[in-house]
Amino acid sequence: MAAFGGPAKPLLSLNPQEDAKFKKEVAQVRRRATKQQEKQKPTPGVIYVGHLPPTLYETQIRAYFSQFGTVTRFRLSRSKKTGNSKGYGFVEFESEDVAKIAAETMNNYLFGERLLKCHFIPPEKVHEELFREWHMPFKRPSYPAVKRYNQNRSLVQKLRMEERFKKKEKLLRKRLAKKGIDYNFPSLVKVLHKNEENASNTGPQNSRKHQALRKKKKAASVTPETPEKAVDSQGPTPVCTPAFLEKRKSEVAKMNDDDKDNEIVFKQPVSGVKEETQETQSPASSKKKRRRKHNQ
């Protein structure tokens, strides 16, 4: 069995004189076979999938769309800043016909409380770098410069930082002087120290005190609305000029009008009053008639 193992040996004809012809024929047969295989291979189709829920990942979406056919490539677009899903992606199927069927069936399909939007992308409009590094798992972007700047520094590191700021400040002032610009600005190191002091002073206790003081100030500023101004009898009396008297009369008239409007008056009909007068007069007339009869 060991003799049959190993790489395949080159094909040789039985007649050594016709070896060259035999090799040419074999090459032609192989070319025809490859061409037939290429013709039989279906052209791939790409579809756009929109309104995807943010909780879905690449593996889940690919597994879902693989029920229509073999998915060769898939790309879910993500934000470069946060790494979160943008809500749309691209799916490439092995066959173009399968891609069209998947786009038709999944368009306006209720998926995770959302209507999916799917449409077929023609091969002319598919970008060459659409599926670049599609097999690589997405990593959230890290910002090392921001982390370095916000890290907690020791005293030595802070002193080095101050020296760097001073050098930059000197260079800036020299450049401005060369260009003939008279501009004075505060040193950057002092500004940094002020910011650090403010950050240290604003603690949880200080912030609570500030909030309590602000609340007290607001309560003092908001005065209760008095409906009428109280007149102080012991205060100084105003000068009685004719203009002042006219103003006072107009104010009193307005007050009376307001009081009249507030009062509710019920008016009784006139017929009822007449009936009451007749009823009250009837007993007196009947007594007079009785007296006359008695005298007769």
UniProtKB/Swiss-Prot annotation:
SMART domains the record matches: RRM
Modified residues (Omega-N-methylated arginine): 248
GO molecular function: RNA binding
Biased composition (Basic and acidic residues): 18-28, 245-257
Record carries keyword Oxidoreductase: no
Amino acid composition bias (Basic residues), ranges on this chain: 207-219, 286-296
Main subcellular location: nucleus
All copies of domain RRM, residue ranges: 45-123
Name this protein carries in UniProt: MKI67 FHA domain-interacting nucleolar phosphoprotein
Organism annotation: Bos taurus (Bovine)
This protein's encoding gene: NIFK
